[in-house]
């Protein structure tokens, strides 16, 4: 047994590799099945990625087709609203269709418009052939929607002018959003020719929208002066026809046209010679008030400019039109500074206004402290932005306000100060300039002081009690007027029932007479009841 155990150990020692670096047998090669399986797995992974990509693309295409289908159905519904407005002579149905125009215009594409033009322009081949070259013909597949809104007798009937104008307006908006302004101009010119030959009250609301986008296309092409005579002609026609929406839109377009070329005198004449319709919607009112505010500000009527621009902000939409509110706030801040008032800091902290009003916040700080050096620094840094905003001319006028504020701050800080020190603090060229500015501030009532010309210093007078002046009374008057204006505008904005609603209702005197007769009749009945008993 011992011999067998030692033999086994010797056999095991021989089977072990030598410890000293002897050659080892190479490991067996991997099974070919494993290699094939890995290759198949890699190939399977690649095909899975391609399949996932194709699936995602197919899903995106399917969702886009569904969105296009919904858009076409919306356009079909809007056309029904227009037809209902024409047949029932109810303009509110037109308003309902136009109210959805911004939402519809964002979903327009070549496929939707191609299907809409083919589906609606069934009897008018000339207009269809004119519009289709501006669109790319889509690749038809079996899954494409067969859009046929007009079938049978309706397909051969002529399209209503309101519907035709609406569909062409969609084309203009799509081309304008695609920055194809030349092509949009051709369609818009053709649309204006068709509208000019029509005299239909149901078309007035659609035409007002067409006027706006027509002028917008020419503005993008920098040809606003070309379209001015056309807008004047349409304004005369709209006024004669008592078209309030057309009047409001065309007046605002003409004012925008004049202000674009800085023709403030012509704009002022247009405002004075025309009457803005009271029945116009709030958006047109907000635009009109902003344009008149710009005119008043240029003509040094700052109080009136502030009033109109405050009303413009009040008329503007609360949660949208952020760009419009930013533009109005920029001009309003400059006007308030020119009036010698400091805007509320909360204006600059609103999230939608904070970034755009940052240069004006720095400008306000410079004016508030009377720091002429900081004012010049802000002007140099943001001069191009102020010019783009159209406020640079007004901001240049603020230099005198900055100097006046600096003089007032110096007067409050020192009871007596030399003219040379004032010139140094205000960064003026000489003490003579400081003497002139201080004398003008005394004459305007900015400070209460006297100048000693011989010794060259300014002596401030004792401060008077502000409550003994008319300033508190004027401040209260301004606030009360503001509250009364809000009340009056709120009452005007309310909707009241028509006067015909009260025709069948009795007056107060008739009601009193009826109640008196009822009382007498009740007494007679009571006496009859008493007489019936023995």
From Swiss-Prot:
Domain PCI: 286-465
Secreted found in the keyword field: no
Biased composition annotated in UniProt, kind: Low complexity: 49-61
Cross-link Glycyl lysine isopeptide (Lys-Gly) (interchain with G-Cter in SUMO1) placement: 38
Top-level lineage group: Eukaryota
GO biological process: regulation of protein catabolic process; ubiquitin-dependent protein catabolic process
Ranges of compositional bias, category Pro residues: 17-32
Region ranges (Disordered): 1-68, 500-534
Sites bearing Phosphoserine, chain numbering: 418, 430
InterPro entries according to UniProt: 26S_Psome_reg_C, CSN3, PCI_dom, TPR-like_helical_dom_sf, WH_DNA-bd_sf
A cellular-component GO term for this protein: proteasome regulatory particle, lid subcomplex
Composition bias type Basic and acidic residues, residue spans: 1-16, 501-525
Glycyl lysine isopeptide (Lys-Gly) (interchain with G-Cter in SUMO2) cross-link, chain position(s): 38
Spans through the membrane: none
Molecular function terms from GO: enzyme regulator activity
Keyword match Cell division: no
Keyword terms, alphabetized: Isopeptide bond, Phosphoprotein, Proteasome, Ubl conjugation
Quaternary data: Component of the 19S proteasome regulatory particle complex. The 26S proteasome consists of a 20S core particle (CP) and two 19S regulatory subunits (RP). The regulatory particle is made of a lid composed of 9 subunits including PSMD3, a base containing 6 ATPases and few additional components. Interacts with UBQLN1 (via ubiquitin-like domain). Interacts with ERCC6.
Role noted for this protein: Component of the 26S proteasome, a multiprotein complex involved in the ATP-dependent degradation of ubiquitinated proteins. This complex plays a key role in the maintenance of protein homeostasis by removing misfolded or damaged proteins, which could impair cellular functions, and by removing proteins whose functions are no longer required. Therefore, the proteasome participates in numerous cellular processes, including cell cycle progression, apoptosis, or DNA damage repair.
Protein family: Belongs to the proteasome subunit S3 family.
Protein name: 26S proteasome non-ATPase regulatory subunit 3
Organism lineage: Eukaryota, Metazoa, Chordata, Craniata, Vertebrata
Gene behind this protein: PSMD3
């Amino acid at each position: 047994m011992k011999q067998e155990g030692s033999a086994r150990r010797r056999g095991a020692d021989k089977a072990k590799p030598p410890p000293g670096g002897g050659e080892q047998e190479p490991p067996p090669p991997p099974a070919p099945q494993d290699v094939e399986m890995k290759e198949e797995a890699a190939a399977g992974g690649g095909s899975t990625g391609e399949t996932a990509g194709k699936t995602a693309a197919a899903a995106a295409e399917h969702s886009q087709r569904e969105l296009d289908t919904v858009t076409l159905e919306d356009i079909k519904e809007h056309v029904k609203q227009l037809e209902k407005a024409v047949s029932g002579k109810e303009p509110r149905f037109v308003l309902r269709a136009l109210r959805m125009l911004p939402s519809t215009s964002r979903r327009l594409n070549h496929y939707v418009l191609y299907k809409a033009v083919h589906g609606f322009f069934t009897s008018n081949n000339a207009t269809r052939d004119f519009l289709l070259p501006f669109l790319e013909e889509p690749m038809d597949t079996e899954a494409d929607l067969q859009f046929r809104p007009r079938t049978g007798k309706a397909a051969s009937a002529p399209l209503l002018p309101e519907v035709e104008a609406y569909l062409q307006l969609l084309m203009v908006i799509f081309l304008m959003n695609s920055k194809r302004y030349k092509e949009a101009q051709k369609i818009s010119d053709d649309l204006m020719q068709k509208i000019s030959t029509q005299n239909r009250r149901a078309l007035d609301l659609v035409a007002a929208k067409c006027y706006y986008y027509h002028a917008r296309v020419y503005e993008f092409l920098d040809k606003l002066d070309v379209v001015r005579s056309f807008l004047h002609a349409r304004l005369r026609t709209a006024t004669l026809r008592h078209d309030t929406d057309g009047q409001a839109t065309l007046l605002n377009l003409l004012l925008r046209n004049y202000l674009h070329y800085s023709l403030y005198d012509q704009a002022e004449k247009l405002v004075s010679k025309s009457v803005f319709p009271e029945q116009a919607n709030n958006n047109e009112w907000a635009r009109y008030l902003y344009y008149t505010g710009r005119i008043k500000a240029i003509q040094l009527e700052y109080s009136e400019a502030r009033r109109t621009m405050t009303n413009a902000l009040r008329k503007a939409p609360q949660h949208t039109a952020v760009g419009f509110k930013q533009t109005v706030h920029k001009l309003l801040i400059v006007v308030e500074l020119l009036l010698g008032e400091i805007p509320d800091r909360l204006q600059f902290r609103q999230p939608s206004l904070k970034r755009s009003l940052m240069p004006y916040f720095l400008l306000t700080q410079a004016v508030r402290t009377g720091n002429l050096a900081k004012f010049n620094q802000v002007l140099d840094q943001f001069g191009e932005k102020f010019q783009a905003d159209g406020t640079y001319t007004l901001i240049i006028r603020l230099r005198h306000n900055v100097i006046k504020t600096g003089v007032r701050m110096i007067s409050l800080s020192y009871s007596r100060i030399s003219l040379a020190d004032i010139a140094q603090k205000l960064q003026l060229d000489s003490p003579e300039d400081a003497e002139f500015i201080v004398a003008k501030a005394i004459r305007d009532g900015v400070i209460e002081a006297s100048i000693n010309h011989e010794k060259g210093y300014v002596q401030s007078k004792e401060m008077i009690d502000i409550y003994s002046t008319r300033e508190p009374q004027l401040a209260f008057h301004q606030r009360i007027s503001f509250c009364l204006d809000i009340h009056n505008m709120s009452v005007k904005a309310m909707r009241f029932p028509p006067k015909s609603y009260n025709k069948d209702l009795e007056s107060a005197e008739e009601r009193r007479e009826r109640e008196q007769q009822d009382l007498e009749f009740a007494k007679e009945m009571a006496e009859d009841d008493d007489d019936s008993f023995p």
